[in-house]
Regions:
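Beta-propeller domains with acidic blade repeats across secreted/periplasmic ectodomains
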Residues: 1-262
Length: 262
């Protein structure tokens, strides 16, 4: 659950095994179908054979949880979401590890969860390739892993590029990825940088401390020991607060948002 940029809405993310909560409205056109040009090859181990579109989803609701609106769909199993300085929403989506080596394997990836977006998860071999006109590609592919927490670098006492980054945690490979965004059209592309790494380092979630600007992250799970770590900057670069917003592409993002509101 993530508080929206205006402080008035709660954004809720759920994986492909979680049913939609019967939202009263939808920003996503409800045109999803399970028709396939070629017969689907279901998962050989039986995973999610009976789970149909729209897969994982993002909804937003009021603080009381009374009115729900569907924002974005087609995810595999996104654990965490966060907003950047432009008020744009990003998630770290899971892969289906049993698909590894198949033509339809989709690695863990960072998705720009635009209003009305469809990211193409379908069970078995039915997943949409990123070049399909009715789906959206990732901002950046990460690779095999187990996504957990996602946070914004806003408020961190770090150099400016790290304040503007999105941080994505991978439990399996013990990495906290700094996702450095670059505007592209009305969206973004990105490069990843391993900000923190260790083996083992089963990272679960993180937060930027609102007072001291350090990053705190937790590790543990599945029988491993739990710890809490703190990351602080020590160096000569300025840590003066930056907005994290991008001037490049601002006009196009404004147009896209106006279209999303139609």
């Amino acid at each position: 659950v993530e508080l929206g940029p205006n402080g008035k809405k709660l954004y809720v993310v759920a994986g492909n095994m979680t049913q939609l909560p019967s939202p009263e409205s939808s920003l996503v056109p409800k045109v999803w179908q399970e028709d396939q040009l070629l017969p689907r090859m279901p998962d050989a181990r039986g995973h999610a054979r009976s789970v149909m579109a729209p897969g994982g989803w993002v909804c937003r609701t009021d603080p009381e949880g009374k009115a729900w609106e569907l924002v974005s769909t087609g995810f595999r199993n996104t654990y965490g979401i966060a907003f950047n300085g432009d008020g744009e929403l990003f998630g770290y989506d899971s892969d289906m590890e049993w698909d590894a080596g198949s033509p339809w394997y989709r690695p863990t990836r960072i998705c720009h969860a635009v209003n009305g977006g469809e990211f193409g998860w379908r069970n078995g071999s039915g997943k949409f390739p990123p070049y399909y006109a009715d789906t959206l590609p990732a901002v950046v592919d990460i690779g095999p892993g187990s996504p957990t927490g996602v946070i914004s670098g806003s408020g961190a006492k770090f150099p400016s590029k790290y304040q503007s980054a999105i941080y994505a945690l991978d439990w399996t490979y013990g990495s906290i990825w700094a996702i450095h965004l670059k505007p592209e059209g009305s969206s973004y592309n990105a490069v990843r940088e391993e900000f923190v790494g260790g083996k083992p380092l089963p990272v679960t979630d993180a937060i930027i401390h609102p007072k001291n600007g350090s990053m705190y992250f937790a590790v543990g799970g599945r029988g491993s020991k739990s710890f809490l770590y703190k990351v602080s900057y020590s160096g000569n670069e300025s840590t003066k607060a930056v907005s994290g917003s991008f001037a490049d592409g601002k006009g196009l993002r404004t147009i896209r948002r106006s279209m999303e509101d139609l």
